[in-house]
């Protein structure tokens, strides 16, 4: 539940603010230098100053810095009064290694904007569960090193973090290519828009992320509540339809799943083989989902572009306008039971 002591208006970005980049999953060594330089330039154009954690380039035989070093960079970013936004560098597989070593009291005392996606799902949801602080599921720092097709993502970033409100309509185009390997020969696909599987407006607290990573938190003290929630879920091209089916089933078996007020499903990557017909069949077989409004093909996850969704903040969905609204200043506590 959102910490009522956090004044989100005071956390909004202003010109000359510092963005701190940390690598709680994989090392920044995996990111090409041209991508890093382009991302830095993008933030300079936004009037923001970029700094990096001391250990973002460290890596062991599994491609990450040690747990102690990754936690140290996280703590340093939250403790530094100059830092206003913390961005994760890239995803990976092991941010959950940090959870039992984090000083959550330090984080709660020094609230910041924190944003990332994919494996960072574990870190984001744990921080929200332990502190009540809203955090954000959205682009990594490396995402901003994309040469083409970044405009939608930047607009969402500005509206959310500078102005505190973003009305998210479906993007005009999307892409699922390996842009970080080939910036020139991009393939952009016309977006048919949100897929409305169950009609209905939604109002609730955002929670979720990468579904397979989110479910790693099940039964732990780092698992966030689903009470009054808009649950948003996505996964990578490695996620098959059978994998998605069982992960979704696991969520429906939670004691608090009956309190979920809506579900948003991020766009599946092409290599997953999951299409809308398959998804509708999976959804139709789950009675726990029958009465829950549900949108799919939403612009978050492992395709581009990226919108930004709060974990522990308000999400509103207007089915007639086909619009998802994120408003940082709204309190989830004001929602009726």
From Swiss-Prot:
It comes from the Bacteria. The keyword Lipoprotein does not apply. Belongs to the peptidase S66 family. One of its GO terms (molecular function) is carboxypeptidase activity. Its EC number is 3.4.16.-. The active site is at 118 (nucleophile), 234 (charge relay system), 302 (charge relay system). It holds the Pfam family Peptidase_S66. Keywords: Carboxypeptidase, Hydrolase, Protease, Serine protease. This is Putative carboxypeptidase TP_0688. One of its GO terms (biological process) is proteolysis. Coiled coil: none annotated.
């Amino acid at each position: 539940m959102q910490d009522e002591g956090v004044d989100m208006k005071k956390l909004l970005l202003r010109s000359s603010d510092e963005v701190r980049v940390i690598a709680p999953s994989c090392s920044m060594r995996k990111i090409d230098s041209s991508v890093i330089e382009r991302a830095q330039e993008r933030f300079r154009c936004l009037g923001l100053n970029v700094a990096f954690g001391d250990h973002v380039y460290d890596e062991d035989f599994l491609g990450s810095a040690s747990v102690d070093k990754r936690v140290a960079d996280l703590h340093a970013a939250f403790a530094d009064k100059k830092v206003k936004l913390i961005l994760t560098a890239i995803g990976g597989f092991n941010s959950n290694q940090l959870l039992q070593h984090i000083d959550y009291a330090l984080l709660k005392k020094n609230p910041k904007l924190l944003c990332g996606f994919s494996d960072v799902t574990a870190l984001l949801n744990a921080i929200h569960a332990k502190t009540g602080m809203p955090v954000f599921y959205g682009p990594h720092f490396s995402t901003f090193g994309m040469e083409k097709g970044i405009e939608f993502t930047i607009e969402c970033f500005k509206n959310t973090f500078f102005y505190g409100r973003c009305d998210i309509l479906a993007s005009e185009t999307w892409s699922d290519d390996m842009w970080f390997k080939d910036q020139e020969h991009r393939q952009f696909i016309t977006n048919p828009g949100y897929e409305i599987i169950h009609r209905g407006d939604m109002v609730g607290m955002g929670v979720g992320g990468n579904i397979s990573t989110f479910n790693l938190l099940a039964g732990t003290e780092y698992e966030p509540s689903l009470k009054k929630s808009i649950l948003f879920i996505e996964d990578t091209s490695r996620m098959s339809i059978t994998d998605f089916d069982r992960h979704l089933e696991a969520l429906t078996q939670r004691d608090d799943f009956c309190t979920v007020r809506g579900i948003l499903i991020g766009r599946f990557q092409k290599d997953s083989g999951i299409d809308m017909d398959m998804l509708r069949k999976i959804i139709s077989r789950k009675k726990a989902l029958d009465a829950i409004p549900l949108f799919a093909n939403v612009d978050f996850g492992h395709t581009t572009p990226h919108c930004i969704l709060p974990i522990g903040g308000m999400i509103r969905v207007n089915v007639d306008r086909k619009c998802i609204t994120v408003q940082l200043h709204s309190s989830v506590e004001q929602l009726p039971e």
